[in-house]
Design a protein with these regions (language model features):
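Active-site segments that bind and position negatively charged phosphate/pyrophosphate groups
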Residues: 196-225
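Acidic-aromatic/histidine active-site loop/patch
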Residues: 98
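A glycine/threonine-rich phosphate-anchoring loop and its flanking beta-alpha core
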Residues: 15, 106-198
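Catalytic nucleophile loop
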Residues: 101
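Predominant activation on well-ordered alpha-helical scaffold segments within soluble catalytic domains
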Residues: 75-78, 176, 180, 190-191, ...
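ATP/NTP phosphate-donor binding region
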Residues: 1-91, 200
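Conserved active-site and cofactor/substrate-binding residues in soluble primary-metabolism enzymes
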Residues: 19, 72, 170-173, 188, ...
Length: 225
């Protein structure tokens, strides 16, 4: 399944496909330096799948949790890119949930005033919501998302297969946003939760949730109201 976020020159494709993680290199140029940002909650096999497609992949695996959205970790990513000679033609790839996406996206927005950002969400909530829209940020002085930027990815690849490794509680909790979206704007999506096993229909759930998020972003990219 494929969607296109239509934002003029900042438009990009959103791919929802089982096995999509192994095809990222077919969808966007990875024949360059790629900072692959992940955390300890992401299976190592996913990281290896991405790195195998990169000509010069530079992995950074951070601690799992909200504390990673810090000035310290942000600086760490920028320093690694500088030490490896990243230029504006290179890329940052987020492999993880919303925390990884927020942090990696802000690093991509900031390094040399912006490098290519690729988002490969691996949690339920990030696949159905936070991976698109361009909001990137870190926390500062105990306040969430104080410092950040609107910076759209060049590609989003949501591979539902990556959700199979999540604890069941985390998988179910992440679906709350999809249930809310169904109640508000998509009766068919809501009915999926009443009649189907969410695991069996997860690709459709992700797709239909992102359709609604995409429509909101296209109308009001920067939440101007």
């Amino acid at each position: 399944m494929k969607l296109t976020m239509r934002l003029g020159v900042r438009s990009y494709d959103i791919i929802i496909k089982q096995g999509g993680l192994s095809r990222v290199g077919q969808l966007i140029n990875l024949n360059r330096r790629v900072l692959v940002v992940s955390d300890t909650g992401v299976p190592e096999a996913y990281l290896k799948t991405v790195l195998a497609q990169c000509r010069e992949g530079v992995p950074v695996v951070l601690p799992q949790g909200e504390g990673t959205k810090s000035l310290e970790c942000f600086g760490q990513l920028l320093t690694v890119m500088l030490e490896h000679g990243f230029t504006r033609g290179d890329a940052v790839l987020a492999l993880g949930g919303g925390v990884v996406g927020d942090l990696a996206g802000f690093a991509a927005a900031s390094y040399m005033r912006g490098v290519t950002f690729i988002n490969c969400p691996t949690t339920t909530l990030s696949q159905i919501d936070s991976s698109i829209g361009g909001k990137t940020a870190i926390n500062l002085a105990g306040t969430k998302n104080t410092v950040g930027a609107f910076y759209q990815p060049s590609l989003v690849v949501a591979d539902p297969d990556t959700l199979k490794s999540l604890p069941e509680r985390h998988f179910i909790n992440g679906l709350a946003e999809a249930v809310k979206a169904g109640l508000i704007a998509d009766e068919g999506l809501f009915e999926l939760f009443e009649t189907e096993d969410a695991h069996e229909k997860i690709e459709e759930i992700v797709y239909r949730s992102l359709v609604m998020k995409k429509n909101v972003v296209e109308r009001d990219e920067r939440e101007a109201g």
